[in-house]
């Protein structure tokens, strides 16, 4: 759902740099910022709290399972109004079928938690600048980019948190399901977001932003495709691990065979998971430096002095 805006954003950015490469360079003042951001995270995927089948967008957010998010951010202007930014953010995401009224999801009764440790780089476009003769002390901005993140879904078993990837709760790694491979706990994300920043009179910048992270994995919550036949665990695992895998693969109470059948649907394999960092308050320090950068007529001319 974000593919078209992302492609447009990247095309405009690439075109801008191509034009700049053809023009004469001159010294201008640019800005850089470094600081921290604090907000909340929320998971968007097969597990969630809305009354619909899980969907990767804001209307599937469950406020009950949002968790704090903390990170650092570095932003540097490449050309006026266009900056590169680097983010490193850590948080925990959660999901619980018990919180939804959707019949299938509530009966499925799965739950999870997973750490998210992300690093990413983005191109950011701002309406106004904090430097130059036309500088302002406020600006809205948008950004898009690419990053990578680590995740490790866990569920509770006998009062302890258990790593789910090693168990193969959908039959991953079992010879009976050669098409179900163990998933990696490292994946790619595509941040898309925006916000608003204000420059104070002592060079500190206070901002507020919200962003979605589309990903290349459907296993942040360890739920994607189909239930396995639990008997296969006992053919290949030791008894303790087989019992645990069977129990965490299907946590329903077995009273509704019309909803959950052996080797039937467990998740939605057609949509990858996503997560958001929302309500992010950024607190950065503003600095200026001079470098030779090409100019574009009209758009940058008055900012170069």
Which residues are covered by each model-predicted region?
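Short loop/turn motifs that connect adjacent beta-strands in outer-membrane beta-barrel proteins
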Residues: 25-31, 80-81, 129-139, 156, ...
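Residues that define the transmembrane beta-barrel architecture of outer-membrane proteins
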Residues: 30, 64-68, 115-119, 138, ...
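Residues on the lipid-exposed face of transmembrane beta-strands in outer-membrane beta-barrel proteins
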Residues: 36-40, 72-76, 119-127, 144-148, ...
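Surface-exposed strand-loop-strand hairpins of Gram-negative outer-membrane beta-barrel proteins
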Residues: 41-69, 73
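Structural signature of outer-membrane beta-barrel domains
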Residues: 41-45, 87, 91-95, 147-153, ...
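Extracellular loop and loop/strand-boundary signature of outer-membrane beta-barrel proteins
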Residues: 55-60, 104-112, 176-182, 266-269
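Gram-negative (and chloroplast) outer-membrane scaffold detector with strong preference
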Residues: 80-166
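Predominantly the C-terminal beta-signal and adjacent terminal strand-loop region
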Residues: 201-305
């Amino acid at each position: 759902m974000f593919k078209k805006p992302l492609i447009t954003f990247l095309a405009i950015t690439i075109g801008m740099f191509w034009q700049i490469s053809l023009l004469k360079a001159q010294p201008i003042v640019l800005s850089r910022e470094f600081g921290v951001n604090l907000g909340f995270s929320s998971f968007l995927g097969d597990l969630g709290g809305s009354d619909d089948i899980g969907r990767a967008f804001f209307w599937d957010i469950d406020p009950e399972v949002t968790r704090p998010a903390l990170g650092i951010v570095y932003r540097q202007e490449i050309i006026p109004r266009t900056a590169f930014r680097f983010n490193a953010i850590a948080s925990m995401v959660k999901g619980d079928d018990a919180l939804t009224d959707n019949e299938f999801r509530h009966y499925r009764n799965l739950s999870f938690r997973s750490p998210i440790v992300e690093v990413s780089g983005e191109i950011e476009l701002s309406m106004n600048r904090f430097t130059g003769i036309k500088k302002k002390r406020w600006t809205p901005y948008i950004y898009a980019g690419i990053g990578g993140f680590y995740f490790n879904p866990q569920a509770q078993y006998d009062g302890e948190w258990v790593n789910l990837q090693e168990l193969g709760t959908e039959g991953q790694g079992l010879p009976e399901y050669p098409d179900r491979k163990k998933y990696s706990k490292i994946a790619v994300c595509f941040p898309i977001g925006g916000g608003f920043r204000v420059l104070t009179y002592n060079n500190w910048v206070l901002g507020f932003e919200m962003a979605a992270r589309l990903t290349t994995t459907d296993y942040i919550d360890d739920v994607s495709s189909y239930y396995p036949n639990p008997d296969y665990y006992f053919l290949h695992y030791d008894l303790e691990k087989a019992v645990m895998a069977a129990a965490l693969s299907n946590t329903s109470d077995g009273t509704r065979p019309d909803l959950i059948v052996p080797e039937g649907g467990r998740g939605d394999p057609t949509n990858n998971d996503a997560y958001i960092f929302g309500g992010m308050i950024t607190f950065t320090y503003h600095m200026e430096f001079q470098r030779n950068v090409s100019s574009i007529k009209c758009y940058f001319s008055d900012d170069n002095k």
